[in-house]
Amino acid sequence: SPVEGYSIEVTKLPKKATFVTEFDDEIAEGLRISLEEEDGNLIEVSTPEGGTAVNFMSRLEQAIKDATLNLDVSYEKEESQLKISHKEFGQIKGFTITSFKDDVITGEQGVPKLFLGTDIEGSLEGERADGDGQILKGNRDNFMTADLRVAYIGEQMGEVGRVTLSQNAMQFQ
């Protein structure tokens, strides 16, 4: 690389697959859902009649832990809000939710709903780079940045920094 390094430009930030919905005791009562991660791991969680949102969340958290799904869940009781998100960024990191109770969670009973994240987009030294989660990779045909990979964890867009390569070592600025 030149002494000043290669510029890193981010035009789109990566996102995690995320699902947010209204959730309270009325919705939780008698609720049954299936939750499937992109790699095929599947769990099913239900609450009996008279079950509460807190009870459902406890069952959901335990099922996710037992199945080692790569998902985070949270419940804001004051806001009546359920949030499920993938722990990793990117378009291939997602999950599917199916609700088996009329008109709640996904809107249609028995119809799976897919949630995907997005990959980072940008360029390295003005050359095209493909995104994979938080990784920008210079295209194989690039003159200066072929196959160069840079992980970006910031929240800014535009020119976000430079990377310098010297004798197969990297120095970040």
Q: Where are the language model's segments positioned?
A:
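Polar, low-complexity export/assembly segments characteristic of proteins
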Residues: 1-50, 62-173
